[in-house]
C-alpha cells in the first residue's frame, strides 16, 4: 500500500490551507482532526485532491512514509502538548514533528529537548501570512533540528512565499529560534499597526480628511518608502462600504482593538532581557487602553483637554508629508528595537541568528512585508550591526526625518490627540542619542536609600557614599 509523504494534524483554517498548499506542490497528504466531521468536510470540499483522511491517530501515523513528517497545526500551549503525547507512542526514532502553531518560544525549547531524548526530530516553525498566506505561500521561520530541516527544506521552499523567485524560508537556528523570530515578527506587526492607526487618526482629525481622501493618501504613500502590505490593505479598508452602498464600514467599527495574547510575549521577554522595546510595548498597551471603552466614555465627559486646531488648506500637503515622514521613522525605530532584541536573545541562547536572512524571509508572504526590508537586508550584510539606527541608510533617514517625528508628536500632544507609539518613538530616539543622560541621579538615589553603589566617570570600580550630613545623623 502506498504511503503518503506528509501528515497534517489540525484542520482549522491554517492547517487546512497548509495541507492544500502542500498537496498543490505534488505531495500526497494524510490529514487528521480530533473532530471527525471537520476532516470529512475538508475531504468533501477537495475530492479531486491527493489528500487522504484518517480517523484514528494510529492509522494516520501508519499511513506515512518513514521517516515520517508530521505538521501540527493545533492551538498553542496545552493542546499542542496533549497532541504530542497522543501521537508519540506511534512514532519511531528519526521521525519529524513540526509545530507550525503560534507557539511561545520557550515551549519550543522544552519540546525540542524532550523529544530529542526520544529520538524524535522537532522543528518549531513560525508561519506568517494568515489564511491566504497558508494557502498561497506564507513566510516560514523554522527552528530546531538542523538535520530535520535539511530533510524537509525542499518541501518548505516549495510551499513558501517567493520574493523575486527566492523562497521566503531559511533555517533560523536551534530549538526555539524559529518561534522566537515569529514572536518578534508579531511584535513589529503590533507596532506597525498602531503607528498607522495614529497616522490615520491625525489625518482624520487635524485635516478633516474623509475616507476617500484617506484612501488616496495611503495609496500615494504605498508608491514610495512606505510600500507595504499593511499600507496597501489600509487604503482598501477606507473604501469598503456597508451593504447599503452608502456608508463606510470603518466608521461603524468599534474602537476596541482586541488581541490573542501573543503581543505580550515579546514585551515580557524584553523585560527579561533588559531590552528597551518601548515602541512595540506601547502598541500592546494601546490595545489594552482601547479596550476600556466604557471608562473612556465617562472620562471624555470629565477630563478636560485642549481645543483641536486644524491645519489650513494651504498647509495641508506639507502636513501630510510631515505625517508620512514621522510614520516612516517610527516604523524604522520599531524594527530597530525588534532586531536589537533578536540580537540579545541570540546571544543569550547561542542561536547565531543571521539577521539579514531573517529580513529576507519577511519580504513576501507575511503581514509585515515591506519594500524597506531590502534596506534591512543590506544593513545586515555585516552581522555585527549593533542597532539599525547606526547603519548608513537608516541613520541618514533618521537625521532627515527626526524633525517631522518631533513636530507631529508635539502637535498631537499639544492638541490632545493620543499618539502613544509616535511619542515612544521620539523618546527612544532622543534617549538613544543622548551621550550623558539623567540616569546618574537615579544611581545616586539608589545608593542613598539602598546602598546599591554606583560607578564614576573618572574612576573604575563601584563606590558607595554616606549621603547623610552629620546634622541629619
UniProtKB/Swiss-Prot annotation:
Active site: 182, 189
Reaction it catalyzes: 6-phospho-D-gluconate + NADP(+) = D-ribulose 5-phosphate + CO2 + NADPH
Matches recorded under InterPro entries: 6-PGluconate_DH-like_C_sf, 6PGD_dom2, 6PGDH_C, 6PGDH_Gnd/GntZ, 6PGDH_NADP-bd, 6PGdom_BS, NAD(P)-bd_dom_sf, Pgluconate_DH
Keywords per UniProt: Gluconate utilization, NADP, Oxidoreductase, Pentose shunt
GO molecular function, a single term: phosphogluconate dehydrogenase (decarboxylating) activity
Residues that coordinate or bind NADP(+): 10-15, 33-35, 74-76, 102
Pathway assigned in UniProt: Carbohydrate degradation; pentose phosphate pathway; D-ribulose 5-phosphate from D-glucose 6-phosphate (oxidative stage): step 3/3
Signal peptide: none
Binding of substrate, residues: 102, 128-130, 185-186, 190, 260, 287, 446, 452
NADP in keyword set: yes
GO biological process: D-gluconate metabolic process; organic acid catabolic process; pentose-phosphate shunt
Function: Catalyzes the oxidative decarboxylation of 6-phosphogluconate to ribulose 5-phosphate and CO(2), with concomitant reduction of NADP to NADPH.
Subunit structure: Homodimer.
Family classification: Belongs to the 6-phosphogluconate dehydrogenase family.
EC code(s) of this entry: 1.1.1.44
PANTHER family: 6-PHOSPHOGLUCONATE DEHYDROGENASE
Lineage of producing organism: Bacteria, Pseudomonadati, Pseudomonadota, Gammaproteobacteria, Enterobacterales
Name this polypeptide is given: 6-phosphogluconate dehydrogenase, decarboxylating
Pfam families documented for this protein: 6PGD, NAD_binding_2
Organism: Buchnera aphidicola subsp. Schizaphis graminum (strain Sg)
Residue ranges crossing the lipid bilayer per the database entry: none
